[in-house]
A protein has these predicted regions:
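Secretory targeting and sorting signals
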Residues: 2-34
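Hydrophobic alpha-helical membrane segments, chiefly transmembrane helices and signal peptide h-regions
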Residues: 16-25, 65-72, 185, 189, ...
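Serine-esterase "nucleophile elbow" of acetyl-processing enzymes
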Residues: 35-93, 131
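Acidic/histidine-rich helix-loop elements
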Residues: 53-67, 95-108, 152, 156, ...
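Acidic carboxylate-rich catalytic motifs and surrounding loops in phosphoryl-/glycosyl-chemistry enzymes
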Residues: 84-94, 229-238
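Alpha-helical cap/lid subdomain in secreted, periplasmic
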Residues: 108-276, 280, 284, 291
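Short, low-complexity, Pro/Ser/Thr/Gly-rich segments in the mature regions of secreted, periplasmic
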Residues: 287-297
């Protein structure tokens, strides 16, 4: 299933858990030189990436896996003696609009992912908790279609994301207990990979990257209005780095293209690629970006 050898993945995960992750917080001090282990729930809200979706030989378009960023985040905290009880309630294709009004493939009307999240938070108000919110990209996706970018669509959808995400977070924060931490998840642009072998698609990649940057700006402003940090996934994928590097099988490309090829399925041949979802290493990179935003309890 993977496009990275198992031994490399295992080594990378070990490094990510032990060395690369900065020890930011799910451990609190109860006295001089003493750490008190922390147990907390982890509510994972979002779309397909929140579920670790990747293409497989059985489902080339993608299926849920246990190698998503939530899984790596739980493993990284476990390596530090921290127990996160993971609850994944995301749904592939989820948008902020569907989150509010329903109509996805996972929750029968009148239920929604938002209702599921609110019910969960209400029943865990006296617990430590971590909530990640991974929304927005699917709202933008209809504007990035068949290697064309629709600026009017982008503007309209970003305004919708701003309104809907604000409403979603307000409801979540209202029912969450006092010891619940929220972290927003930013986005990378998988379509950057389209620029390496086709001049026409290179123009599309440029505009798609512009649209994703604006999406992240909107998300960041909404999260900041609630004093919620946002994981800088775009930076983890080096979206702004255009330094030329050599990639085996591809040649000389900008570093942002190389990163997307290394961290997603976009540069893989059929039937597994091209696919916009992260691979194991990509999900590890997202997990690390989230980890960097976790503050001490």
């Amino acid at each position: 299933m993977k496009n990275v050898p198992r031994g490399v993945r295992a080594a990378a995960l070990s490094i990510a858990m032990v060395a690369s992750f900065v020890t930011f917080g799910l451990v609190s001090s109860s006295g001089a030189g003493a750490d008190t282990p922390v147990t907390a729930f982890y509510l994972d809200i979002g779309a397909s990436s929140s579920l670790g979706v990747q293409p497989t030989t059985t489902y080339p378009k993608g299926q849920r896996t246990d190698e998503g960023y939530a899984d790596y985040l739980v493993a990284a905290e476990a390596a530090k003696g921290v127990t996160l009880d993971l609850h994944e309630i995301g749904c592939s294709g989820e948008t902020t609009n569907v989150m509010v009004y329903g109509g996805d493939r996972c929750y029968a009307s009148p239920d929604t992912q938002l209702n599921e999240a609110l019910t969960f938070l209400q029943s865990h108000q006296d617990e430590n908790g971590l909530v990640t919110i991974d929304l927005g990209f699917n709202d933008l996706l209809p504007c990035l279609h068949q290697w064309l970018t629709n600026p009017e669509c982008v503007t309209r959808q970003l305004d919708n994301v701003r309104q809907q995400l604000t409403a979603i977070i307000a409801l979540l924060k209202d029912v969450a207990g006092p010891n619940v931490k929220f972290i927003g998840v930013g986005h990378y642009d998988p379509f950057v990979a389209d620029s390496w072998n086709d001049p026409y698609r290179a123009v599309y990649a440029k505009w798609s990257m512009h649209a994703v940057r604006h999406l992240d700006e909107v998300l960041r402003l909404v999260y900041e209005s609630f004093e919620i940090p946002m994981a800088d996934v775009a930076q983890a994928f080096k979206i702004d780095s255009t330094t030329t590097v050599n990639v085996a099988g591809i040649g000389s490309v900008p570093e942002n293209v190389a990163e997307v090829c290394q961290l997603t399925w976009m540069c893989q041949p059929e039937p597994l690629g091209p696919n916009i979802h992260p691979n194991d290493l990509g999900y590890q990179a997202i997990a690390e970006a989230i980890e960097q935003q976790i503050t001490p309890w």
